[in-house]
Structure formats: structure tokens, C-alpha cells
Amino acid sequence: VKNTGLVEVPMGTTLREIVFDIGGGIPGRKKFKAAQMGGPSGGCVPAQHLDLPIDYETVKEVGAIMGSGGLIVMDDSTSMVDIARYFMEFCQDESCGKCVPCRIGTKRMLDILTRITKGQGKKEDIDLLKELAEVTKSASLCGLGQTAANPVLSTIRYYLSEYEELINKKDTQSLPQESQTTQT
């Protein structure tokens, strides 16, 4: 966004108001693609939910969390599979390793996401990611493990075609892009 920084808004403020009115919108000629809400283990919310009022229940319904209150805005040049991998790497690194679902689940999801972003994914990887995500969510002992899969689940939910494109194009290598991702 053009105006980065720390802002506090009342519950019920829409994502559109935060990104465009307060944040000043997306720089250049790029378009809004998604907002990752709630910190590293939050979910990615697509443009179709820009008029989403920000409150605990509504945010949860679309696959995100309030979490730390962090908001990262992504433009249309951002690979959502790369984003899921980036946040999973963080969550896997932060896992204390005490419980098996988080320790193994985050590692396996990271390995699969890495393989997909390198153009080595398989069709069954999407279902495996969903299964690992649900087990990690339901069986982990702490909040990190219970929310670590949110970026994976939300990007599969809203950007499945990006996963399928990378899996179907074996010669494509998705590399982290220099995009307009800004924390607000």
C-alpha cells in the first residue's frame, strides 16, 4: 500500500477501507490480489472479500484470523503458492517440536510447497496438503500448530488454479517475486 504504518480501526471497518482509504491503495498500476490477515499463521483473503467487515467471526468465516492484527497486502504480481510457502517456512521454523502434528505436519507441508514452487509438484499434493493441514490444525497442542495451516488452506481455497498451474507445468519454476507486499 502507499501509506504503510500502524493503524487502529474500529471493529466492523471493511478491508477495502483499510487498504484503499487508509492505506492509499496499491502503488503503480498493480491491482489488489489478497490480504494476509492475522500474522504469519493468518489466512489470505482475496479481492472478492474487500467489503468484509473486520471482526472475529467474519474474518474466521473466510479462512483468516485476527491474530496479531497484522495485515500484509499483496498485488496481482504475487504468487500465492510462494506466499503459502513463505509463511509455512516461518511457522515450521517457529514450531517448538513438542507435539508431532505440528513438528511433522508443518515440515511435510513445507516440503510439498517447496516441491510445487520448484515445478516438481504432483496432482495428489493438493489433497495431501489439505489432509496434513486439517490434522495439524485439529491435533496440535498450541495456537501456532492450530493456525499454522491457515495460509495453506486459504490459498488452496481461493487460488487453487495457481497450485494446479504450477503442478501442471513441470518446466515452470516459481521464484519469489519482487512484488508490492507491504505490512499495514
Regions found by a protein language model. Name each.
Residues 1-184:
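Redox cofactor-anchoring modules in respiratory/redox and cofactor-processing assemblies
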